[in-house]
Swiss-Prot record:
Signal sequence, renumbered to the chain: 1-21
Record note on what altering residue 86 to A does: Complete loss of activity of conoCAP-a
Annotated segments matching region Disordered: 131-155
Record-given protein name: ConoCAP
GO cellular component: extracellular region; extracellular space
Annotated gene: conoCAP
Effect of residue 93 to A: No change of activity of conoCAP-a
Effect of residue 89 to A: No change of activity of conoCAP-a
An example molecular function term from Gene Ontology annotations: toxin activity
Localization per Swiss-Prot or TrEMBL: Secreted
Positions where Asparagine amide occurs in the chain: 94
Source organism (scientific name): Conus villepinii
Source taxonomy: Eukaryota, Metazoa, Spiralia, Lophotrochozoa, Mollusca
Propeptide: 22-48, 63-82, 98-160, 177-207
Domain of life assignment: Eukaryota
Disulfide linkage: 53-59, 87-92, 165-171
Length: 207
């Protein structure tokens, strides 16, 4: 006994086949899935704007969900397409499809002022890189000199590490002393017993 579904399928099959043949996305996908010899014959100027593009099924537009229908509904199965390396608002392009026919957005000449700005920026970056290299060489030389001075016991002195370095003139590779503006005065106070007693009395300390 023939079911009602089989009867409807036989009746609607001639109607669904022309609709499937007229689907622009299926035509696009069939062109992409062709071999390279047949694909090269496809005209680039007939490519319409693609709304969605990913790395698995190429570009698909508003009929992307319908083009995934099964073969029994009159739609062929979508083959696994190769990844498209470049995609913009004009569609996906690869080595088989030239960029010359992509439209005015890709064929617009480059503004000469942008080239000048790019050259100026490149020169500035090169100058900054060379200045940074020279500064690094100077720092290495200063570190080597400080290493030689620190090996001399007479030159080691009372050097101590700074507690705080910032960008306002903190550590600059010279003699790094702890509170260097006050170090000499503190040494004078430490040598003078009467001044030390007065300072301890003033601060409330007991010697």
């Amino acid at each position: 006994m023939v079911s009602l579904g089989h009867v409807l399928f036989v009746i609607l099959l001639p109607v669904l086949l022309p609709v499937a043949a007229d689907d622009p996305d299926d035509q696009m996908l069939s062109q992409i899935s062709l071999p390279s010899s047949s694909r090269s014959e496809y005209d680039d100027n007939d490519v319409s704007k693609r709304v969605f593009c990913n790395g698995f099924t190429g570009c698909g537009g508003r009929h992307r969900d319908r083009s995934r229908r099964q073969e029994r509904y009159g739609k062929r199965l979508i083959p696994v397409l190769a990844k498209r390396p470049f995609c913009n608002s004009f569609g996906c392009y690869n080595g088989k499809r030239s960029l010359s026919g992509a439209g005015p957005a890709l064929s617009t000449p480059v503004d000469p002022s942008r080239n000048n700005k790019a050259r100026t920026m490149a020169r500035m970056l090169d100058a900054a890189a060379s200045a940074r290299h020279e500064q690094q060489q100077q720092l290495l030389q200063q570190r080597e000199q400080r290493g030689l001075e620190s090996r001399d016991p007479a030159a080691s002195g009372d050097l101590s590490k700074r507690l705080f370095c910032n960008g306002y003139g903190g550590c600059r590779g010279g003699k790094r002393t702890l509170y260097s503006p006050w170090l000499e005065r503190m040494n004078e106070v430490a040598d003078d017993r009467s001044a030390r007693n007065a300072l301890c009395t003033r601060l409330g300390w007991r010697e």
